[in-house]
Amino acid sequence: NSNFHATADRGNNILFCSYTPSGGTFTVWKANGVNEKPQKYIEYKTGTNIRFGWKISIQGDLDANALITTPVFQKDSKVQFARWRVVNGVLQTQDPEFVIMSSSLLTSNWIKWADVIYTDDTDTQSDYFLASHVTDTSAKRYFYWFKGTDNSIKAANTGAPGNTIINAVDYAVFNKVPYVIYNQVNSFNYAVTGSDAVRMYDLSSGSFDNQIVVCPDKIYGGLENSGQNTEGTGDVVFKAAKNGYYLYVYLVFSNGGIACYQYDCIDM
């Protein structure tokens, strides 16, 4: 369980987190680039009936300012995540703050598949996004945009079938335009080959109205194991080029493929 998930910031830092079942110590290691030996960065005793570590995300740069988030399961039977703040390159505390999301979401479906990321690297009241298997009163799975001021739902996309797992998200601003991306997978044994997909949105209108096609569905997911993504997992990552010309989208699916797509700001 010492290396369950990895993520990177907007600089050159990488975080590795442990999966921590009830009563364990949630540990996060930090490395400055792929050639540096990881060092312990966060150690937090979780207590009983709490699970940490299925996912971890960073908004910002750990050498400057950042917000670190990880979903929390089975704590007080609420839909919530843990948050750490980094200010001027300094982690503010080993103990996280807990953020409780909209009570309209059904906690019975708040299980291991989830990811959370903020839109700002310093403002804890900025908006954030939730990729998860949680539902509201319907049977569908939705990708949620939350208002950070009161942790209520600001917007939800049109939804995916109930057996779909939405479990990874990333957010970036490219040439002053905000973008969000998430994945959706199917871990069940009746999943057809390539059932996994990626969704990306231009958020400049303040809604999910402007979807951008990243790639055709049914070409990268579930290539092995008879088309089954057993863990129901994958990842999506934005990376903007330093020269401002290109935005790269990276995607990966368990038992599936790895791909990179390039977008530019050139108007032909």
Residue locations for each model-derived region?
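Beta-propeller fold detector
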Residues: 1, 37-46, 92-103, 153-161, ...
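Repeated scaffold domains used in trafficking and secretory/extracellular systems
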Residues: 2-9, 48-60, 105-119, 162-176, ...
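Conserved beta-strand positions in repeat-built beta-propeller and related beta-rich domains
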Residues: 9, 16-20, 70-75, 130-136, ...
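Entry beta-strands of beta-propeller and related beta-repeat scaffolds
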Residues: 12-16, 62-70, 122-130, 177-181, ...
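Structural motif
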Residues: 22-30, 75-84, 136-145, 187-200, ...
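Short loop/turn segments immediately following beta-strands, especially the blade-tip
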Residues: 29-36, 82-91, 145-153, 200-208, ...
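Loop/turn-rich, solvent-exposed surfaces of beta-rich toroidal or solenoidal domains
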Residues: 166-201
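Blade-level signature of beta-propeller repeat domains, shared across WD40, Kelch, NHL, RCC1
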Residues: 231-268
